[in-house]
């Protein structure tokens, strides 16, 4: 990532979960340091999960399972605390982040894919359900 023409490392932050929105999005209080906090919506970087708010009952079932998986990981991690590596903001203004919880070496993003709750996604046309 470049800032003022110079390559810099990605930024890492400590967070406190507010709520899980769906399988690939949560709201959190982000600690910016110097006793400064901001509440932001975090879109999980590099993954997409099936929709939990849809009329397609099979897709909804998979979407709700992904949401429950994320909720369990984040709520049971150090009283809702987790860390993120920020990848900037997405097209809808959400923070794009890789989430990390205590007790897991892999990111929540990777765990979602590994456990069949998500697929790789970097802004391209979304997959149809079942695809």
Residue ranges of predicted features:
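Small beta-barrel nucleic-acid-binding modules, primarily SNase/OB-fold domains
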Residues: 1-131
């Amino acid at each position: 990532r470049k800032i003022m023409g110079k390559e810099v490392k990605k930024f890492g932050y400590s967070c406190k979960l507010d709520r899980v929105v769906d399988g690939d999005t949560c709201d959190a209080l982000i600690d910016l340091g110097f006793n400064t906090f901001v509440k932001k919506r975090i879109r999980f970087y590099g993954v997409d999960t099936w929709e939990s708010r849809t009329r397609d009952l099979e897709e909804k079932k998979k979407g709700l399972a992904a949401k429950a998986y994320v909720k369990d990981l984040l709520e049971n991690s150090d009283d809702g605390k987790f860390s993120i590596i920020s990848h900037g903001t997405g097209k809808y203004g959400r923070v794009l982040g890789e989430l990390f919880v205590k007790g897991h070496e892999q990111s929540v993003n990777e765990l979602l894919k590994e456990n069949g709750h998500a697929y790789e996604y970097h802004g391209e046309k979304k997959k149809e359900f079942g695809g």
